[in-house]
Amino acid sequence: MSIIQFSHANGFPAKTYSVLFEQLKEHTISAINILGKNTNSNDINYHDLTDEILESASQFGEPVIGIGHSLGGVLTLLAAAKKPEIFQYIILLDPPLFSPYKRFLIKVLRAMKIEDLFSPSGKSKKRRDHFDSKSHAKSIFLANKLFKNFHPQALNDYVIHGLTAGKNDVKLTIPVAKEVAIFHKMLTSFSKNVYKVKGTLVYAASNPILWTSDLHWINRKFTGLQVIPFPSSHLFPLEYPESTAQNINRCLKNFNLRFK
């Protein structure tokens, strides 16, 4: 049994991943439900979010397995690079870990103030964040292609935990403004320590956010990362949590065989 420190994707509270966690119940799961919950949109940044993960992971007094999806994957990588003694291994689920070429493009787009035309932030800005009720929100989600392949329970969990009731309506628990701000704060440079981390990167093979050039760069620079595909799109931990858990357990088994 391992202790897992899990970090969620941008916009999806950790409790949305309950099906995945259930499949990993032989392990102890620690997860901050909403990273940056008490930070406003203007002040949120990757470094503070990384420190939140480190604070949570360090409470166990022994090295943990760091697992993160998307944003959570990048933050897990940064955390393991900053305090390697806290992590015995990391598993990154389709992190937006881009090559220098793509990061340069992002910097140019930011300088031109047109990042939203190409970044997920543009779509996030258009998201509806208030609904009449949770049932009303669910009906809208079901018609949204973002959720079309979601595991039914994952969608239910998102309706329960991704929405907060107000006086007369419900709203997204993670506000659109904060989700957009996190996309806008995506790092365009990394410290040299990130290249020393050991672990596995599982990338989405369908409609990939990681281009072939990104994967070539990752394979060349991150010599301690095993890179493997998953036959689905970016949200696969919420779409196919059982298969994702099987992949995670295989990664952990291989880690135990290789390093223990």
Model-predicted segments: where are they?
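Flexible "cap/lid" loop of the alpha/beta hydrolase fold
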Residues: I90-H130
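Active-site loop/oxyanion-hole signature of alpha/beta-hydrolase fold enzymes
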Residues: A31-I67, R103, V108-L109, Q246
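Conserved HGGG/HGGXW glycine-rich cap/lid loop of the alpha/beta-hydrolase fold
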Residues: M1-T39
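The conserved beta1-alpha1 loop
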Residues: Q5-A9, H69, Y203
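Conserved serine/cysteine hydrolase catalytic core
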Residues: Q153, G162-R220
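Conserved alpha/beta-hydrolase catalytic His-Asp/Glu region
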Residues: K125-I182
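Catalytic histidine-centered segment of alpha/beta-hydrolase-like enzymes
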Residues: S232-E242
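Conserved hydrolase catalytic core segment
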Residues: P63-L105
